[in-house]
């Protein structure tokens, strides 16, 4: 049975790091769909309403449903802007969606950003512009992840939640 893990939250919250660790934990054949890779690297478009990444992300979620046991969708993925992706995911995966929202204070995300390899690409000003406080989705039933949880704990919690349902 196919499962979808959705990791959402503001820039610098640890989504990509957790997605990569989950991919290693689940093993080969686990599909990671990174909003940054699709939007910034593949299409090179701004994150604005109706951007070209939305249908491609949707198509990749569909591909994951058809070809991967576990698909991980990660990114800022603003709740209002990416509703189309979430709605299609809900149609495909039903109750096999494990959605998490990294609900961290801005200062924590800024601190974490300073440890990233791409820290020189953008800074505090851009992160403040992109910031959305508690941007939970109406479509996804998201479990909050707070600053007190460490990466290993997050990975194991999600891994066991998915395996328990398998």
Residue ranges and their predicted role:
Residues 7:
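Hydrophobic anchor at the beta1->P-loop junction of P-loop NTPases
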Residues 10:
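P-loop (Walker A) phosphate-binding loop of NTP-binding proteins
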Residues 13:
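ATP-binding Walker
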Residues 93-112:
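Conserved phosphate-donor/acceptor-positioning beta-strand/loop module used by diverse small-molecule
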Residues 115-157:
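Small-molecule kinase domains that catalyze NTP-dependent phosphoryl transfer to phosphate-bearing small molecules
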């Amino acid at each position: 049975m196919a499962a979808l893990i959705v990791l959402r939250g503001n820039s610098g919250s640890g989504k990509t790091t957790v997605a990569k660790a989950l991919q290693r934990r689940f093993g080969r054949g686990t599909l990671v769909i990174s909003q940054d890779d699709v939007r910034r690297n593949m299409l090179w478009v701004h994150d604005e309403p109706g951007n070209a990444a939305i249908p491609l992300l949707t198509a990749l979620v569909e591909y994951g449903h058809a070809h991967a046991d576990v698909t991980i969708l990660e990114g800022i993925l603003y709740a209002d802007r990416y509703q189309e992706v979430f709605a299609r995911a809900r149609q495909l995966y039903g109750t096999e969606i494990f959605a998490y929202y990294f609900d961290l204070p801005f200062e924590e995300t800024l601190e974490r950003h300073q440890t990233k390899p791409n820290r020189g690409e953008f800074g505090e000003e851009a992160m403040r512009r992109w910031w959305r406080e508690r941007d939970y989705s109406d479509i996804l039933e998201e479990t909050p992840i707070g600053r007190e949880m460490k990466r290993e704990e997050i990975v194991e919690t999600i891994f066991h939640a998915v395996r328990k349902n398998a």
